[in-house]
Amino acid sequence: MLLRMSTLLLRTLREDPADAEVPSHRLLLRAGYLRRAAPGGYTWLPLGKLVLDRVAEVIRTEMLAIGDQEVHFPALLPAEPYRTSGRWTEYGDDLITLVDRRGAEHLLAPTHEEPAALLVKELFTSYRDFPVGIFQIQTKFRDEARPRAGLLRGREFLMKDAYSFDLDEAGLQAAYDRHRSAYQKIFARLGLDYAVVHAVSGAMGGSASEEFLATSKIGEDVYVGCTACDHTANTEAVTTLAPPASNPEERPATQVHDTPDTPTIASLVGLANARALAGRDDWAAGDTLKNVVLTIRPPGAAKSELLVIGLPGDREVDLKRVAATLAPATVTVFDGWADHPELVRGYLGPQVMAKLGVRYLVDPRVVPGTAWLTGANEPGRHATNVVCGRDFLPDGTIEAAEVRPGDPCPACRTGQLTLRRGIEIGHIFQLGRRYTDAFTVDVLGPEGQSVRPTMGCYGIGVSRAVAVIAEQHHDERGLVWPTEVAPCDVHLVAAGRGPQVETALGLGNRLAEAGLRVLVDDRGHVSAGVKFTDAELVGIPRTVVVGRRLADGYAEVRDRPSGKRADVRVDALVEHLVNEVHSG
């Protein structure tokens, strides 16, 4: 393959686009890989399409290697299967829906579990047909409220999704392990630094799931590691170690105190110590019980319901953790104080939740026998020694508090948690029988009995992976593509006119005939300096400069990742580059 920049659909930019927030977005636009077509939608230009196709081919190769077969489902699907599974409402506002001229409702599919289950139901009737593994690389859609960060958070994106069907849990586990191993090979080939972390299943359903998170300072996901063991988890999936419970009746009696002008935890702790409430002057924020009011709207519900969460006052509520726990319900911060005078803002306590009929969930650290300084449900008043199990009975526990560095590891219980940011590039799930139950997918077992297959699903964001590679492989001058996914193997720069251009084109043709992918900068209207700047911005791994040393029979080979340069004889250049590319 030979591309000439004099005719290539490519325009580089000298300045960062104003709306580009993250490095990958800035560089992919500046280097001419993408153009914004709409909010959350991008046109792939030739170099970008080459990278996208190469990433997809790496994924396709590894999926075929584990025995999955490639299919292609429609992107436009009828609503009914998604109503049957419940996801028509569970996906909420993220689902893009439409009505055709006949009045029938459709959706632009975000994932394809439903059609995959229906396909297996239609094709297979016997246990002899299993296991089954299928995958597709398909455009998906999500109605993002605020598309941002270029390819990392768009409304339209390319995704690989695979589905496994097995007759029992052992088969599902084997399929899950195969795909997990394949993902590790894929991300290694793509040159990505990543972590595999425990995750929640969310609207997908099922039991076990893991995310593959590419390490990145701009990542929206936060995950934990442990200083003493190999435990990793998305913070949404972190469990809190609870202290031992004790006898609530052994605690002192509750006392109510006047605490004017203390609507915040800091002001309350300051007053409590100044006045030595309950005979103490060592109160800390962690001794207080903060009560946070949220609104919850289950899928398809006509109205929201109130939820109050009690947690130690030194912790903030992490709404992402709450949303993950309560999915698929929509969670928002309560702002209807004027309509609920029974909820005393700033002085809310747990003692009245049952009387008010408000659902009350607490942090796992709030166990029977723990005593708290908390609101007395009267303006300007708080109570000490409000004891869980005596003065209030929660409706349950919830993982809602922020996770902090130094928190105890829930796996080994000896190490401390560390926090890092990452970008989700893959997610694998053990779905179980949620979808085969929904569509009554049954086959004949070996003893003539009815057997219901169990499913797994395995997703990779293909277009997102392009952006993530760009995030991890760039420098101050531009992109630095790994060889496996670079749009071309060699970038030939004719640093002059006449013989330099002719030699560069001749070398390009010979390299293309040898099986390499070549980009030749044969533009006659730009300076050598601009060509060198563009070569670094575009980020092809090897640049060959045909310039002033051509008269001596030499060209300069520049290695983009390391910056090393070497003069190579022109008559040996093709063999040199072919060997270099093929050796890795």
Curated annotation (Swiss-Prot):
Localized where? Cytoplasm
Segments traversing the membrane:
none
What Gene3D superfamilies has UniProt attached to this entry? Anticodon-binding domain, Bira Bifunctional Protein, Domain 2
What does the UniProt keyword field contain?
Aminoacyl-tRNA synthetase, ATP-binding, Cytoplasm, Ligase, Nucleotide-binding, Protein biosynthesis
**Cystine pairs:** none
Q: Which InterPro entries match?
A: aa-tRNA-synt_IIb (IPR002314), aa-tRNA-synth_II (IPR006195), aa-tRNA-synth_II/BPL/LPL (IPR045864), Anticodon-bd (IPR004154), Anticodon-bd_dom_sf (IPR036621), Pro-tRNA-ligase_IIa (IPR002316), Pro-tRNA-synth_IIa_bac-type (IPR004500), Pro-tRNA-Synthase_IIa_type1 (IPR023717)
What segment(s) does the record annotate as region Disordered? 242-261
What's an example Gene Ontology biological process for this entry? prolyl-tRNA aminoacylation
- Name one molecular function that GO assigns to this entry: aminoacyl-tRNA deacylase activity
Q: What is its main location?
A: cytoplasm
Reaction catalysed by this chain? Answer: tRNA(Pro) + L-proline + ATP = L-prolyl-tRNA(Pro) + AMP + diphosphate
Q: Where is the signal peptide?
A: none
Q: Which GO terms describe its cellular component?
A: cytosol
Task: Specify one Pfam family.
Answer: HGTP_anticodon
Q: What is its EC number?
A: 6.1.1.15
Domain notes per entry: Consists of three domains: the N-terminal catalytic domain, the editing domain and the C-terminal anticodon-binding domain.
Q: Which NCBIfam families did the record assign?
A: PRK09194.1, proS_fam_II
Protein family per UniProt:
Belongs to the class-II aminoacyl-tRNA synthetase family. ProS type 1 subfamily.
What does this gene product do?
A: Catalyzes the attachment of proline to tRNA(Pro) in a two-step reaction: proline is first activated by ATP to form Pro-AMP and then transferred to the acceptor end of tRNA(Pro). As ProRS can inadvertently accommodate and process non-cognate amino acids such as alanine and cysteine, to avoid such errors it has two additional distinct editing activities against alanine. One activity is designated as 'pretransfer' editing and involves the tRNA(Pro)-independent hydrolysis of activated Ala-AMP.
- What is the recorded name of this protein? Proline--tRNA ligase
Q: Which organism is it from?
A: Salinispora arenicola (strain CNS-205)
